[in-house]
Every structure is written in C-alpha cells, then in structure tokens.
Amino acid sequence: MSPLNGVARSLPRPFQAVARRPFRVAQPAVACPSNRRSFNHSRSLRSTGSQSPAPSPRDSSNPALSFPCLDAQEAKSALLSARSLGSGPEPSYTAGHHERFHSDEPLLLDWGGLLPEFDIAYETWGQLNEKKDNVILLHTGLSASSHAHSTEANPKPGWWEKFIGPGKTLDTDKYFVICTNVLGGCYGSTGPSTVDPSDGKKYATRFPILTIEDMVRAQFRLLDHLGVRKLYASVGSSMGGMQSLAAGVLFPERVGKIVSISGCARSHPYSIAMRHTQRQVLMMDPNWARGFYYDSIPPHSGMKLAREIATVTYRSGPEWEKRFGRKRADPSKQPALCPDFLIETYLDHAGEKFCLEYDANSLLYISKAMDLFDLGLTQQLATKKQRAEAQAKISSGTNTVNDASCSLTLPEQPYQEQPSASTSAEQSASASETGSAPNDLVAGLAPLKDHQVLVIGVASDILFPAWQQREIAETLIQAGNKTVEHIELGNDVSLFGHDTFLLDVKNVGGAVRKFLD
C-alpha cells in the first residue's frame, strides 16, 4: 500500500484566496479538475454607468474552484487500476499472523443460506488450564480483526492492547483469552472476499445474508474444536456486546459470566438508519459493481465516505467542541468545498485511512447483521421456524435453500412527519422511559435469568445510546435476573461517545476486571 501513501502526500494544495483591489478583479488561470481547461481573463467592474453584460462562456465572473479532494480520489483510482492490471486484485486484507480453524461441516444460516465449509481466524493469550474452564471469549466490533493484543508472532498493538495482559482487565495470568474475526469478515474468517469452494470464485454478493447469531454459532464450532465445553465469560463491546448476549441466549449452559459494553438487545431505528446510510453511500460507488470488484478497482470512494459517516456516530459532539471547535485548518486561505474545518480534515483522514483496510462487502454484510439483531422471543421463534424449514429442504436433497430475490418496498402513502393520533404511548416510549421492558424482549432474555451479567453504557454515546443499555438491564431484571450489574458513565466521566470502550481503561476496564474477579 506504500504507493498510496505517496499519493496522499502529493495531493494538490487547497484553493488559495486571490488578492483583490477595489472595483477590479484580476484572476490568474485556474485549472478546472472536471474538464482540465484553463480560464484566463481580466475584466473591469464599474460601480457606475450601464449594467455589465452577462458573462460569456469564455469570460466567467469568477474562476472555478479547485477540488484537491476529488483529484486525490481520481489519482487513487488510476493507481489502483494500474496496479490491478499489473499484479492482480487489490487490496489484500490481512491483520497479520493468526490461527485458523477450518470446519468441513456445513453451516446453516438463519436466513436460509448455507456455507459448505468455513474458516474462523482467531488469536489467543494466556494459558488454557487443565479443566479448560478459564476461557474468556472476546467479541469484536464491526470492523475489528482477531488481533486484540500484540503477540510474539504479530507484535503490532491490538485494538484492545491496554485491556489484555498480566494484571490487566482480561488478566492473562488467570484467563485464556480467545478473540475471533467474525464470520463475514475479511481478516482470515470466511466472508464475501473468500473463494466459494463450489466454483473457485470469490463469493462477493453471492455470500448469504448473515445474523449475529450465525457468527456466534461459528465461534462455538471453534470452541468445540478446542475442547472448551463452557466459557468462564463472554465479553464484548458494540457489536461484540450483541454477540456476548446472543452467546448466552443460544448456549446458556455453555456460558458463565456475560459482559455487554455499549451494546443492545435489539437494534433500534436510529442505529439502523446510520448503518443503512453508510451502505447506500458505498453501494452508489460505481466501482462497487454490485459487489464484484475483486479483480478491479475497489470502491474506495464509497468506503471513505461510509467511514466518515460512521466516525460521526463513534464520537460525541461535546468532545469535538473541545477538540476542534470552529477552527479551520488554515484560516489564512479562502474557504474551500473540500475539507476546510479541522473537524472536516479529521473525518477525511479517518475515511482515507480506512478505505483500503477493510473489505466493502464485509462492511455491507456485517452491518446488515447488526440491523437484523433482535433477541425478542418473537424473532427467536420465527428464526427457529426458518431454520427448521431450511434444514428440511436440505434433508430432502434440495440444493438451493437461500432465496436471494428481493424487492424494493416503498410505502403507498407518504410518511407522516408527526406521530399519528393512534400511536400509543407504549409504542413511543422506550423501556428506560416507562420503567417496563417489552414483554417480548423479557421472554427472549429469559435464558439469562441465572447468569451474572455486567452491562455498561456511556451517556455520550449516540450510536448505542445509554438508554439501550438500561433497556438490557431492566429487561433482565424483569426476566428474573437478580444479579445483573448496570454501570452508566456520565458526561463528566467520558466524552468519547461510542469509542469509550476502546479508550477508557480506568472506568470500562476497571469495572470489567472487578466483575470478572
């Protein structure tokens, strides 16, 4: 990837302000990125007399702005195009050395898909004891790899580096910690960028729709392989917080303690909307090519923009007020439509850094799995029925069990911008507002009534707002759980929003360590 870094360093300089004198504008030639033409004109502006004639196409009132941010994207596309023709598909997704579990046993997925075989990438820290009862399964967020902490084989710092190790949150003197790259990912586990063994071509968007529960079932295949009958604890943050709860619901007899940080028991409209927007931006990139881009230019522009949207949801407004305020990157220059304010340059950097580090299709599939997440009993029963029907088709010899057809369903009437008179207070209020969790969710979390559960939320989190963690705790209490612990970090403790679980070793790490001990 080093040539791309060179491109980033040689980006065109932002549009510079032109010195002006009263009643006269002298404009130099300005390159227009869209058509590469130059305009060279000088024209007098009179304060009195007859009205000036309308500018002709060759004599514009002002020069066109330059767009170095678009130039950079075009340059990157050109470089990737040349590279893909000369050295095969780009990029290669990897997080470094990891172990790999391969299962030859087919995996039936919740929505009817079938993986004839699959791999799960994983890494471990600490020592597995003789009874194999000191295992902590660490679940990741959406785009993380199995590399949660550095290892001898891969010394690069992991995404939870400060939380894992001797005497730390996940104490490797006591516990054997396992972290996997989720099913559907691109860091060693089977996903859209994996070759389909049926035809030798990459799955791309032929990969079946996934659920969080599918990911957990694949993880437990790994545990079976390692001879781990029961986990000491299931720990996760963000999407990992979903997985941690799902592990307990799916395998209540195989999970001890449960930790869910900045997660939820079911996805809610705001979070779904933000992930949908990211997917739409990505899919509108022409290079996405309906998912079949592996032998050509990856949709780096769509990925960049999707990551920028995601970054807005990962942090908090109050933090950015303190960190960036209204500062511009260079106040001496004329405002530009490309990144100009410090916050814009921050988002631009976040998107640029990510756009070739992660597979676009993995982002689509895994984010959709998050949207589909619902531990309510109704959804669990519907899924059980779907799986039974799919299994019956497989047993009868039907080859295709996955219905890949879909339709764009739009409302017959325009949406109302205000709640209708028929909307009940129960429909409008969350569990945290009413003090009563939905009966369906209470029934769905009943398998966890005898588990020790720690739920942590962050007041400044806008992606998984703190009321969603309160909903988990209140639901568990109503389901009969008498030991659930709920901690909410206020704005006086953390302004880092959803990313707090990655940064706050003292409050997040301290609470988890105390709970595990």
From Swiss-Prot:
Chain residue ranges for the region called Disordered: 34-66, 413-436
Gene Ontology annotations of biological process type: cysteine biosynthetic process from serine; homoserine metabolic process; methionine biosynthetic process
InterPro entries (alphabetical): AB_hydrolase_1, AB_hydrolase_fold, HAT_MetX-like
Catalysed reactions listed for this entry: succinyl-CoA + L-serine = O-succinyl-L-serine + CoA
Region (Important for substrate specificity): 141-144
Residues of the site described as Important for acyl-CoA specificity: R275
Coiled coil regions in record: none
Pathway assigned in UniProt: Amino-acid biosynthesis; L-cysteine biosynthesis; L-cysteine from L-serine: step 1/2
Catalytic residues (positions): S238, D461, H498
The AB hydrolase-1 domain, residue ranges: 134-386
Enzyme class: transferase
Compartments where located: Mitochondrion
FT transit peptide: 1-46
One Pfam family of this chain: Abhydrolase_1
Annotated NCBIfam families: homoserO_Ac_trn, PRK00175.1
Function of the protein: Transfers a succinyl group from succinyl-CoA to L-serine, forming succinyl-L-serine. Also has weak serine acetyl transferase activity and homoserine succinyl transferase activity.
Protein name: Serine O-succinyltransferase
Gene transcribed to yield this protein: CysA
